[in-house]
Amino acid sequence: MNAAVNKSPQPLTDTFGRVHDSLRISVTDRCNIRCFYCMPEEGVHFMDRAEILTFEEIERFVRAAVPLGISKIRLTGGEPLLRRDLPRLIEKLAAIPGIRDMALTTNAVLLEKQAADLYSAGLRRLNIHLDTLDRN
């Protein structure tokens, strides 16, 4: 029998020897605001929806990453709250054995409407970016 088959997966390590335990997943390239440094009004080309990973593909990828030491997931975008049925994805990912932290980076524009469902699905941490304190 091939010895490589019985070998446990090695943790994800960068060229400096640092072990990585977190995975950032962009669930959409769409955004509902236009920050000049990220989504300028012109020149942004969005991916076809068929090119964006399905929830099943994302779940399969995370399941494959857990044996490599991944235990933390951060969902980003674009604006991840624009992704339809996001709580369903969070629920699937939070239920994967070995995942101990689920986080979301958001501009929070849509958060009020979705917060309860996100929490119920297993989201426990938010990173809210404020790109200005000026309403205009």
Regions picked out by a protein language model, each given a short descriptive name:
Residues M1-N2, D134:
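Short intrinsically disordered, low-complexity coil segments enriched in acidic
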Residues N2-M102:
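Conserved alpha-helical substructure of the radical SAM core
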Residues V27, V44, P80-L82, R100, ...:
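Conserved radical SAM core fold
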Residues A116:
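Zn2+-dependent cytidine deaminase-like catalytic core
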Residues Y119-A121:
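Acidic (Asp/Glu)-rich catalytic clusters
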